[in-house]
Amino acid sequence: MTIRLMENFRAIFYAPYYAIQTLGFYKSEGVDVALVTSDTPGDAVAHLINGTIDLAWAGPMRVMMAHERDLASSLVSFGEVVSRDPFFLIGNCDSFELSKLAELRFASVAEVPTPWMCLQHDLRETGINPDAIKRVSDRTMADNYAALRKGELDVMQAFEPFVSMAEMDRAGKLLYAASARGPTVYTAFIATRDAIARHREAFAAITRALAKMEQWLYDNSAEELAKAVAPSFGHVPDDILVASLRRYRDADLWARNPAMSKQGFSRLSSSFVSGGLLKRSPAYETCVEESLC
């Protein structure tokens, strides 16, 4: 049987999900995994519930929100991959501090909610009211990067490859790495409990493959990882891809084992509560399937 795995969206920080297939770790565990692309970020949940896919990778936010809407939701996360926040602030400011953000022309990520939710929580913890910050919140990262290059923005929030591009283009520099805050569970597998019951052996094999992949990440160079994922990022120049992956690897972005961090889960849910996305923090045990790890 083939497990249908849906991609959330294409991003360099998802490199382990592409490399695990290229390097044959699924195959070595005797499981066949077919990658399915999604139309928009977040639409995997509907596909999981109606059974058109078996598994997806996404932020635990999707699971947390599902449980807030329905206490009996069958959605769960397992197999942590991205264990820190992969977003950055990029700009041309000297001696930047978060407290200066209110004085600057700033654009946050519009494509998905988690980056801003996490950043606004960082701001609150430093005594800054995020509601007092004027920000552009309705443009893509690509559009914001174009504005940064033209001098129409001072600071933008983005993931790689925009940091490495900005450095190479001399359009800006790294001002703030959200990964530095520490564990924040950003991406894992999600499935329904029914699917886990049906495919327990296959999902256990996928988790074992993931453990091998995560060990490989820190035993090999960014150049080797770039070779493994290059087919998924044909539009990214080789030097930019390597620089992006090295930055993430050096930041300890990826988990070193598949068990989901309770500290990282708590940090993420607290960010959603303070930002108004959730009314209360969900229980770890309700949202995480621990038996597979």
What kind of region is each of these model predictions?
Residues Y18, M64, Q120, S164-E167, ...:
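Predominant activation on well-ordered alpha-helical scaffold segments within soluble catalytic domains
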Residues T2-I128, R135-D138, D154-E160, K173-L174, ...:
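Short, glycine-/small- and polar/acidic-enriched structural segments
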Residues M1-A34, A255, F265-C293:
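N-terminal hydrophobic or amphipathic helices and topogenic motifs
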Residues D143-F233:
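Pocket-lining segment of extracytoplasmic ligand-binding domains
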Residues Q21, L48, H67-E68, L148, ...:
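Hydrophobic residues in alpha-helical segments
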Residues I53, W57, R149-K150, Y248-K262, ...:
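Short amphipathic alpha-helical segments at helix boundaries and their inter-helical linkers
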Residues A197-K279:
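Secondary-structure end/capping motifs
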